[in-house]
């Protein structure tokens, strides 16, 4: 497994070293600091059919654990498959495979479906899987919502989550936005059976 992770990371890195494209996001965090996500990627193909490989890193300007990893993805006509490996300091590592399918898009409303499986190895030795899927809706004005269901079989825990986003302001090129976000999730079974989590926030986000 370790050798696969090393080969996977080297493959992604070798792809992006040839005219890689750098980009990312900076977002305000209600708990302090700024969340910074950066990635270097290379796309082969066109907008309708392509293969993308890259490396990424994420962290907060106030400190805390940083995450880094690599990914590969193949897309065609709005459908796609992806594979990602990530490592978070003082937490563990995850290998995630996912698929998404385009269901509807009339240039104003967009609806997509997705499914995923992740395998996480914690630094303390505990390993667990997470499988699930969901639906995501996006409006051309920047509003959106998503519904996700997942299961961790090792804990016999199922989770249902709903999130939403309302765009309050956007720059002319839509690279910077002010969004109101909220979400609610509930656990069924496992150590958090019956627990409901709610969150709401106001965030400034910028793409570079």
UniProtKB/Swiss-Prot annotation:
It is found in: Secreted. InterPro entries: Attacin_C, Attacin_N. Keywords: Antibiotic, Antimicrobial, Immunity, Innate immunity, Secreted, Signal. One of its GO terms (biological process) is innate immune response. The keyword Signal applies. GO terms for cellular component: extracellular region. Residues 21-47 form a propeptide. The keyword Nucleotide-binding does not apply. Residues 1-20 form the signal peptide. Hemolymph and fat body. It comes from the Eukaryota. Pfam families: Attacin_C, Attacin_N. Induction: By bacterial infection. Belongs to the attacin/sarcotoxin-2 family. Hemolymph antibacterial protein against Gram-negative bacteria. This is Attacin-A. The lineage of its organism: Eukaryota, Metazoa, Ecdysozoa, Arthropoda, Hexapoda.
